[in-house]
């Protein structure tokens, strides 16, 4: 399928799911009406039954209670199903919109933006209409963080590249499963701040870890209360004995109430988030995979005969049971009879003892799967993109029909480009608006994706993994009293230091030393590039300064010239955005100023 056919598939799926959602909504309405009549009809019939006999009334109450509870469960089941179908409809509609260039449904990752980062700010990695927003389909904070880290620190070892590519390819082929996973996570988005108190509790010392007496009392006192109640009902013991034991249990609870409340405050109402974790783990556990990397993740989730989903589900049930204390009357009765708070905490601490080391691992695995799904979705939506290959002839970067993912394919101009071996510097000259900066970002974005294990916008690409470093959009800083020019010098110093340290740096620079006069800028740029070439630096630099082009003859085989040319025909100017060999011969600043009437 091509992108247009994929878009049509998304739209038809969205329509189908909306129809299914409406059908489910009608069924839910019918169930709601039945619940209403069951409740009030049961009350009326029970009242009539009691006029005949107590037994008839009790039987009718029990029958209608069972029917009402069954309808309630039936309602909850179909309500969740309707919500799931609604999520699937939204997913397909959002993907269709994304293929039309509308990315507003997806988080842009603004919180990850960092102007001091090696490259993310320069290449629009995060923010509105960024690469992150283009890729991001995560439904958990953990997945969002992992995807952001893969993109902002993408250097990958050779041995890890192919396994990751295989995992992404496999997930691309599982479009229905990907949507099921995403829809499962959309019900209650898994947020780190909601889970943090749960993780903190798991690291705390157990309340009863060193008290055998407490454990004995917690098991024996409820038994004593139950036995005394039975004996009181049968007339063997007077009721005051039971009341005395009941109140004694409440006093015992009161003695540890502060600790109990602290634990409950940390864990209360976390069930819905655990339910979300359970659904995501279950979706992954129940799917079969071929790629070794995904199977390694699966082993971390459900290895050693442990079901992560089942274990999390058990924790959720324990927390639900603990939350019954929120109803003061029920909590009072349960604590007086069964020491319910202590019983709940003991069961929770048993779970903590068994799984506290695994739970953070499960969360991390959920995040990895979430991030992989985003990249799998990217592959599915772009069938013409290719997976890059690690270079076997030592070329740092070479590509055919290289383009930028975020430019509409109808307007995208692609280029063939080869940098050469390590130690090569490419000087790209050209007029204003000729396409230099866009090309630099095109190289950077595809290099990032290549090292992430994802496909690139090209028909063919070879590369050597390295550490990307850019200086393209330097910002001044009022808060740190740092001027624009000083900020740029600081980045150039960092680049030089990285190269000298032996890091495999791949640099991309755009018009350096912009904050000084032309002669000073030209001299400074030349001296800086001479130093970079001397140190064996590898990368690209775009410039308007054609005098830098002479470095090619001074360093044959090490420095190469490329350019973007323009055509000026009378009052018209034409940009073809195609990279060429050599140094640009045409500039357009005065022409553009005249066109805009600035010089009139």
Q: What do these predicted ranges mean?
A:
Residues 1-431, 438-468, 490-491:
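Alpha-helical coupling/stalk and coiled-coil linker elements that connect catalytic or binding modules
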Residues 375-600:
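ATPase nucleotide-binding head domains, primarily ABC-like/P-loop NTPase cores
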């Amino acid at each position: 399928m091509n992108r247009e056919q994929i878009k049509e598939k998304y739209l038809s799926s969205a329509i189908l799911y909306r129809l299914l959602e409406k059908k489910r909504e009608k069924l839910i309405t019918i169930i709601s009406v039945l619940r209403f009549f069951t409740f009030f009809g049961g009350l009326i019939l029970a009242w009539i039954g009691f006029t005949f006999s107590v037994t008839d009334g009790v039987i009718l109450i029990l029958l209608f209670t069972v029917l009402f509870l069954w309808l309630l469960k039936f309602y909850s089941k179909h309500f969740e199903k309707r919500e799931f179908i609604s999520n699937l409809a939204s997913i397909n509609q959002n993907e269709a919109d994304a293929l039309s260039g509308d990315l507003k449904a997806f988080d842009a990752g603004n919180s990850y933006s960092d102007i001091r980062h090696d490259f993310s700010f320069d290449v629009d990695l995060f923010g509105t209409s960024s690469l992150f927003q283009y890729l991001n389909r995560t439904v958990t904070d953990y997945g969002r963080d992992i995807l952001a880290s893969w993109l902002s620190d993408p250097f990958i070892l050779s041995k890890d590249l192919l396994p990751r590519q295989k995992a992404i390819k496999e997930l691309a082929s599982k479009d229905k499963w990907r949507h099921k996973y995403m829809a499962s996570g959309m019900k209650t988005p898994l947020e780190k701040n909601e889970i943090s108190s749960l993780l903190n509790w798991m690291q705390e010392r157990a309340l009863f870890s060193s008290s055998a007496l407490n454990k004995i009392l917690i098991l024996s006192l409820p038994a004593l209360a139950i036995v005394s109640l039975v004996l009181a009902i049968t007339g063997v013991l007077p009721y005051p004995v039971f009341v005395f034991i009941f109140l004694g249990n409440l006093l015992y609870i009161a003695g540890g109430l502060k600790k109990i409340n602290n634990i409950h405050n940390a864990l209360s109402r976390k069930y819905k988030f655990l339910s979300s974790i359970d659904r995501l783990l279950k979706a992954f556990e129940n799917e079969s995979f071929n790629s070794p990397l995904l199977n390694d993740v699966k082993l971390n989730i459900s290895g050693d005969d442990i079901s992560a989903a089942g274990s999390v589900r058990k924790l959720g049930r324990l927390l639900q049971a603990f939350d019954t204390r929120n109803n003061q009357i029920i909590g009072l009765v349960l604590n007086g009879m069964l020491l319910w708070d202590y019983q709940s905490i003991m069961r929770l601490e048993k779970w903590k003892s068994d799984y506290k080391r695994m739970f953070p691992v499960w969360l991390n695995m959920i995040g990895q799967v979430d991030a992989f799904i985003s990249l799998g979705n990217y592959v599915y939506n772009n069938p013409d993109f290719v997976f890059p290959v690690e270079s076997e002839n030592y070329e740092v970067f070479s590509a055919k029909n290289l383009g930028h993912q975020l430019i509409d394919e109808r307007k995208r101009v692609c280029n063939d480009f080869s940098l050469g071996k390590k130690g090569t510097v490419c000087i790209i000259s050209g007029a204003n608006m000729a396409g230099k900066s866009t090309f630099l970002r095109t190289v950077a974005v595809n290099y990032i994706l290549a090292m992430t294990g994802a496909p690139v916008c090209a028909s063919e690409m070879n590369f050597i993994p390295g550490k990307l470093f850019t200086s393209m959009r330097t910002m001044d800083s009022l808060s740190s009293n740092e001027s624009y020019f000083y900020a740029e010098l600081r980045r150039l110093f960092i680049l030089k230091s990285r190269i000298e340290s032996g890091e495999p740096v791949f640099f991309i620079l755009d018009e350096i030393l912009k904050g000084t006069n032309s002669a000073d800028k030209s001299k400074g740029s030349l001296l800086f590039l001479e130093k970079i070439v001397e140190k064996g630096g590898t990368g690209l630099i775009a410039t308007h300064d054609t005098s830098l082009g002479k470095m090619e003859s001074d360093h044959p085989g090490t420095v190469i010239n490329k350019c973007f040319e323009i055509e000026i025909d009378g009052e018209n100017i034409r940009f073809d955005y195609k990279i060429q060999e050599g140094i640009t011969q045409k500039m357009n600043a005065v022409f553009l100023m005249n066109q805009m009437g600035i010089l009139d």
